């Protein structure tokens, strides 16, 4: 598993992108002034789903957040993707906001 830090050109923070053997990826954004890491862009190739890769990527994303000195992870889930919402719940995430077709979720690390 490889983690690559990418500074953005707008200077609002930075992102760490985690790649798993070319079959999955996730990003963690760290924005100036926020006290959490924001997890987004979790993708696993369809042929490799249901093999624990998504869970492994999430664990690595949480590890990166802790290494950067934060103790909270947040993410958004589309309401229409109920199975994804339930999967994040199994990983320990709790809904903190229900707005505009999305659930905002948080996990204390």
Task: Give the location of each predicted region.
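Residues that form or flank phosphate/diphosphate-binding pockets in enzymes
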Residues: 34, 52, 83
């Amino acid at each position: 598993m490889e983690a690559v830090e990418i500074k953005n050109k707008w200077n609002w923070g930075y992102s760490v992108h985690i790649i798993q053997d070319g079959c999955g990826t996730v990003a963690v954004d760290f924005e100036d002034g926020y006290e959490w890491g924001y997890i987004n862009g979790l993708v696993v190739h369809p042929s490799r789903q249901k093999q624990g890769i998504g869970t492994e990527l999430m664990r690595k994303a949480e590890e990166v957040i802790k290494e950067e000195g934060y103790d909270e992870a947040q993410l958004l889930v589309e309401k229409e993707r109920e199975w994804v919402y339930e999967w994040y719940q199994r990983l320990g995430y709790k809904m903190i906001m229900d707005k505009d077709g999305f659930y905002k979720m948080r996990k204390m690390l």
